[in-house]
Amino acid sequence: MIKYDKLWITLKKKNISQYKLIKYYGVDKAQLQRLRNNEIVKTLIINRLCNILDCNVEDIMEYVPDEKISKS
């Protein structure tokens, strides 16, 4: 699973609010909602956030392995 928990930490460190992302950088509210819910997001959005925040992809997202499903 891809998780975007690091995005919110990076936003805080860079002193950029969600309001600012929407108002000044044109990030769609629906995209932010998808990120909040760890849902599918286009790589274009990830690239854009990295440019806005001047950061690397690992600063806004991480891979967390899904729990293995045991076959019984």
Region annotations inferred by a language model:
Residues 1-20:
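A short, Lys/Arg-rich alpha-helix, primarily the initiator
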Residues 9, 61-72:
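Short, charged recognition helix plus adjacent turn
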Residues 38-51:
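Short, basic-rich loop-to-helix N-cap that marks the start of a DNA-contacting helix
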Residues 15-33:
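Short alpha-helical DNA-recognition segment
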Residues 12, 23, 51:
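Alpha-helical residues within the helix-turn-helix
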Residues 12, 26, 37, 65:
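Residue-level detection of the helix-turn-helix DNA-binding "recognition helix"
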